[in-house]
């Protein structure tokens, strides 16, 4: 048996293994994952409960993965055995990698959903409210599609005053994602302008999952989330549920259903308005009756208030005049009394003083009459006897009296007096 060098035996092993295991499919759990930022190559191990094998995924193949490779994932790798002669190491050179039990597209979608969920794309608080009465709606679809025709038909019946604007868009195949993203951005560019759209509806009819899968793309999700205009996703049929349905502000099961959800029914609103009119008329009549009664009550109150207030003011003025006159009278009498006390006893018999005394008595009687005048009722008269004021209760039968007021004077004789 020939003696081989280390290099020779490794070279023979390389030739044998690479020829024998040209294509293999191996299942295991991903561990020790390292992705080189510069080269883009991924290095990892695939293990089961008893053994481990190293793997490499070069950049070209890594770029074709639709999902992110992570530690702990159960994967099936497809590739060939390669041997590194200088170290005698062997590994699987991976051409493709698929998740165990589920497809790579499904895993990629689940990973994208989780990513967007963490960014808040599905949160209710980030959803815009549906407009109540849309006047202008942008429909992102193919202008030759049955979906567009159905949407126009339903809109014209439900809410004919709404203007539907079709933004012709490629809705499947290569270039679909970019076309949809550009159409969303175009419709949203009118936000806060005179020609702004009240809603953006992304719509297309049913199809295979391959036809609809473009609407699971992250770029479309970003465009819907970042739009400042209310958005709806109406892709496929009721059973089709896509990423755009989760990100849009509202989902409709079909394009036709989108119009039924978005647009109010004019017939229903006409019936409501009729009902509102009846209720408003009834409420107005009740309110008018209440206000009329209130005004009548207020008018009566103001009349009473005006009379009572005027009477109160007049009485107050009269009382003030009475008090003022009494004060002046007392002051005058005190003055005269003081003056008389200063006159000597001899002067009391003088004709001059007698004249003044008589004048003072007349003045006192006049003041009493004036004082009585303050108490005179509205239709009464002054009562005097011998030019002196006298109280009614002081009269007796046969007295001759004078009655006077501002307008007239009269003489009378008392026939009888009844004491109360």
UniProtKB/Swiss-Prot annotation:
<keyword id="KW-0540">Nuclease</keyword>
<comment type="subunit">
    <text>Heterooligomer composed of large and small subunits.</text>
</comment>
<dbReference type="Pfam" id="PF13742">
    <property type="entry name" value="tRNA_anti_2"/>
</dbReference>
<dbReference type="GO" id="GO:0005737">
    <property type="term" value="C:cytoplasm"/>
</dbReference>
<comment type="function">
    <text>Bidirectionally degrades single-stranded DNA into large acid-insoluble oligonucleotides, which are then degraded further into small acid-soluble oligonucleotides.</text>
</comment>
<dbReference type="InterPro" id="IPR003753">
    <property type="entry name" value="Exonuc_VII_L"/>
</dbReference>
<protein>
    <recommendedName>
        <fullName>Exodeoxyribonuclease 7 large subunit</fullName>
        <ecNumber>3.1.11.6</ecNumber>
    </recommendedName>
</protein>
<dbReference type="Pfam" id="PF02601">
    <property type="entry name" value="Exonuc_VII_L"/>
</dbReference>
<dbReference type="GO" id="GO:0003676">
    <property type="term" value="F:nucleic acid binding"/>
</dbReference>
<dbReference type="GO" id="GO:0006308">
    <property type="term" value="P:DNA catabolic process"/>
</dbReference>
<keyword id="KW-0269">Exonuclease</keyword>
<comment type="similarity">
    <text>Belongs to the XseA family.</text>
</comment>
<keyword id="KW-0378">Hydrolase</keyword>
<keyword id="KW-0963">Cytoplasm</keyword>
<dbReference type="InterPro" id="IPR020579">
    <property type="entry name" value="Exonuc_VII_lsu_C"/>
</dbReference>
<dbReference type="InterPro" id="IPR025824">
    <property type="entry name" value="OB-fold_nuc-bd_dom"/>
</dbReference>
<dbReference type="GO" id="GO:0008855">
    <property type="term" value="F:exodeoxyribonuclease VII activity"/>
</dbReference>
<dbReference type="GO" id="GO:0009318">
    <property type="term" value="C:exodeoxyribonuclease VII complex"/>
</dbReference>
């Amino acid at each position: 048996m020939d003696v081989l060098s280390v290099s020779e035996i490794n070279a023979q092993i390389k030739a044998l293994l690479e020829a024998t295991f040209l294509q293999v499919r191996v299942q295991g759990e991903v561990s020790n994952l390292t992705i080189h930022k510069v080269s883009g190559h991924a290095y990892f191990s695939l293990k089961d409960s008893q053994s481990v094998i190293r793997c490499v995924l070069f950049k070209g193949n890594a770029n074709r993965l639709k999902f992110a490779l992570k530690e702990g994932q159960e994967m099936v790798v497809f590739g060939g055995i390669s041997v590194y002669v200088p170290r005698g190491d062997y590994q699987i050179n991976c051409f493709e990698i698929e998740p165990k039990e589920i497809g790579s597209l499904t895993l990629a979608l689940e990973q994208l959903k989780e990513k967007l969920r963490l960014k808040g794309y599905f949160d209710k608080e980030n959803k815009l409210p549906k407009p109540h009465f849309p006047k202008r709606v942008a429909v992102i679809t193919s202008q030759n599609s049955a979906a567009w025709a159905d949407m126009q038909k339903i809109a014209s019946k439900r809410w004919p005053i709404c203007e539907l604007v079709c933004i012709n868009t490629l809705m499947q195949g290569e270039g679909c994602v970019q076309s949809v993203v550009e159409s969303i951005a175009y419709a949203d560019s009118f936000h806060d302008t005179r020609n702004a759209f009240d809603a953006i509806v992304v719509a297309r009819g049913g199809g295979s999952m391959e036809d609809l899968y473009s609407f699971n793309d992250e770029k479309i999700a970003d465009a819907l989330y970042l739009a400042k205009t209310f958005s709806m996703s109406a892709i496929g049929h009721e059973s089709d549920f896509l990423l755009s349905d989760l990100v849009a502000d509202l989902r409709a099961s079909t394009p036709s259903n989108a119009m039924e959800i978005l647009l109010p029914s004019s017939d229903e609103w006409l019936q409501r308005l009729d009902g509102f009119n009846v209720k408003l008329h009834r409420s107005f009549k009740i309110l008018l009756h209440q206000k009329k009664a209130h005004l009548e009550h207020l008018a009566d109150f103001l009349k009473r208030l005006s009379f009572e207030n005027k009477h109160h003011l007049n009485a107050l003025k009269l009382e003030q005049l009475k008090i003022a006159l009494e004060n002046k009278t007392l002051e005058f009498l005190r003055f005269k009394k003081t003056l008389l006390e200063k006159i000597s006893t001899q002067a009391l018999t003088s004709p001059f003083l007698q004249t003044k005394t008589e004048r003072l008595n007349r003045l006192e009687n006049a003041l009493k009459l004036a004082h009585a005048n303050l108490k005179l009722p509205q239709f009464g008269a002054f009562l005097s006897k011998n030019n002196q004021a006298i109280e009614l209760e002081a009269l007796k039968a046969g007295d001759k009296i004078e009655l006077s007021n501002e307008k007239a004077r009269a003489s009378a004789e008392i026939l009888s007096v009844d004491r109360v």
